[in-house]
């Protein structure tokens, strides 16, 4: 199973990635357990203390860039969308908040459709 975590180098993204690595498999109702083969951590920056595991792939880029989103979603089985500009930053830079929080989400959903 290949997993994409947008906002993957943020606090929650790193915690989620580590938990998934610890689990090693995911099981969905009515299906056999599936091994986690790759976790793509996608964010605007590399971040610190990213889990070190050969199954981790770190990709930096803009969540609102169609080419980047097409590349990181290619072959993905599961997506956790955590990328966001938090409230105070979005209020300080409204255009950035709209670009990431709205347009980035819309692009991701459209690409996955």
Briefly describe each language-model feature range.
Residues 65, 104-107:
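Conserved cofactor-binding/catalytic machinery of classical short-chain dehydrogenase/reductase
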Residues 22-42:
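Short mixed-charge
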Residues 98-105, 112:
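Short alpha-helix in the Rossmann-fold core of NAD(P)-dependent oxidoreductases
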